[in-house]
């Protein structure tokens, strides 16, 4: 299974909204990748900027997979990749 960039953003929005007790629409996410830091996300909630590392992103995807697809997946089953856009491959 493959999650699109939009689904990764949705996963992070839902995850951070639950953690910060705001609506998912109040969360802005920008996905990033560079050779030095790997996969990261810039999250803005109520004017405050927070950076998520890959482990945080994987946690959000794990929770998203369970809540949206009723599938329990673990971090070693999720592989993030990027070309023109970022995606996540979910392996069984």
Where are these regions (language model features)?
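Protein-protein interaction and targeting regions used for scaffolding, dimerization, and localization
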Residues: 1-92
């Amino acid at each position: 299974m493959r999650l699109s960039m939009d689904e990764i953003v949705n996963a992070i929005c839902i995850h951070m909204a639950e953690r910060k007790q705001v609506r998912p629409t109040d969360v802005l996410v920008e996905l990033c990748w560079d050779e030095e830091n790997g996969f990261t996300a810039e999250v803005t909630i109520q004017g405050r900027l927070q950076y998520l590392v890959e482990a945080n992103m994987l946690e959000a995807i794990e929770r998203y997979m369970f809540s949206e697809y009723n599938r329990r997946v673990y971090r070693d089953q999720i592989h993030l990749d990027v070309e023109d856009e970022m995606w996540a491959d979910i392996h069984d």
